[in-house]
Swiss-Prot record:
Organism from which the protein derives: Methanococcus maripaludis (strain C7 / ATCC BAA-1331)
Localization: Cytoplasm
Purpose of the protein: Component of the proteasome core, a large protease complex with broad specificity involved in protein degradation.
Subunit structure, interactors included: The 20S proteasome core is composed of 14 alpha and 14 beta subunits that assemble into four stacked heptameric rings, resulting in a barrel-shaped structure. The two inner rings, each composed of seven catalytic beta subunits, are sandwiched by two outer rings, each composed of seven alpha subunits. The catalytic chamber with the active sites is on the inside of the barrel. Has a gated structure, the ends of the cylinder being occluded by the N-termini of the alpha-subunits. Is capped at one or both ends by the proteasome regulatory ATPase, PAN.
GO annotation, cellular component aspect: cytoplasm; proteasome core complex, beta-subunit complex
Taxonomy, superkingdom: Archaea
Record GO terms (molecular function): threonine-type endopeptidase activity
UniProt note on regulation of activity: The formation of the proteasomal ATPase PAN-20S proteasome complex, via the docking of the C-termini of PAN into the intersubunit pockets in the alpha-rings, triggers opening of the gate for substrate entry. Interconversion between the open-gate and close-gate conformations leads to a dynamic regulation of the 20S proteasome proteolysis activity.
Protein's UniProt name: Proteasome subunit beta
Main location: cytoplasm
Catalytic activity, EC: 3.4.25.1
Active site (catalytic residues): 15 (nucleophile)
Amino acid sequence: MISNSEYHKEYMKGTTTVGLLCKDGVVLATDKRATMGNLIADKEAKKLYKIDDYIAMTIAGSVGDAQSLIRLISAEAKIYKMRTGNNMTPLSCTTLISNVLHGNRHYPLLTQLILGGYDLINGAKLFSLDPVGGINEESSFTATGSGSPTAYGVLEAEYRSDVTIDKGLLVAVKALSSAMQRDAYSGNGISLAHINKDGVNIYSDEEIEGFLKKINKKR
């Protein structure tokens, strides 16, 4: 039998995800590799999800736990909109997720989350959540997963407090690209999105390839 601590270690050691707070929105990025121990289990893993018109989230950890949580939160966001006529705010969504995670703290959902959103009143918001519901509201950037130490190195060097989404996209892609070169549990491409006053925009593989070419030209 696998103990809870051993299970936690097995499922929390892969992935790289990053989030950047920009002056006009939020940028989120993840790699696409899913691992089980030393096995690359999936080369097209989805780790970036649109939750609502103005909210998106990245996942790291146990895929099943994260997907179950995403289905629940997406449904709650739809119900909220039907009842009130308004979109759930990023803070409200984060608080709801935190309550669900904390309610399961004795049998925790083995996932670490980054939530980015745009509040039409209060602007861009970026949060990170731990497996038992702890919330951090980020004022600049954050990263999770086994490749996060490398990603943080790039983010620390490249991030500026007045960064725009256009620049933030390049910084996020560069951070992911660097992490994938150094971390065996991250790789197989990048998923990328931004959230601003116009909503969630998820980029195509072709658009991401264009960002990679811009970065490589500067090296």
